[in-house]
Amino acid sequence: MRKILLTAAFAALTLASSVSANWITGEPTILAVNSGEAAFHTALTSDQRLDVNLTAGAEGKADLTFTTKASESALSLTALPVLVNEEAGYADAKLTITPLVNDANGLRFYLVDTGEAGGAHIVSYKGGTFKSAFNAADLENINGASSFTVEKKQILFHTKENGTDATYTLSLDTKSLTFTAVK
């Protein structure tokens, strides 16, 4: 009887710990351009690099390339729409890249926040390879402004168009390293 109780207690602890993964964010990299075009090169880690071409004008666009020193593989995201804010005759475009780690399995991701729903992405990194893990443009009828919120236990994707707000909960499939959005 005691053995059964100990086994049940151990199983309960094991199941509880596998469900209690936390999302941990790193310091975001914020890139901005004012009425024009700019190229940025930044280190994500000592081995990972991000190259960005960001344009602000009548519309904003961004091209991103994730690379590593050790691998020839690269992930390119091209012509991502970026929200342009116009104030005092200036067109400003801003792009935010936020590192994200799942503490249960150590998987690393990068949130790409362009402010425009069609440009929002999550990029995964595992074993020297970058992969697109979430593309908001794949969601049905997604337009307008957008943002991510990272909470301890979940990632939320918010959209706002014509005064209508929508929130999606993003669930990670650890086998495919992709996120599924549920409204």
Task: Indicate where each model-derived feature is located.
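Entry beta-strands of beta-propeller and related beta-repeat scaffolds
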Residues: 49, 104-110, 152-156
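Terminal domain-start segments
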Residues: 10, 20-92
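Acidic, small-residue rich beta-repeat scaffolds with periodic aromatic anchors
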Residues: 21-46, 54-59, 125-183
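Long, charged/polar, surface-exposed segments that mediate recognition or autoinhibition
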Residues: 96-135
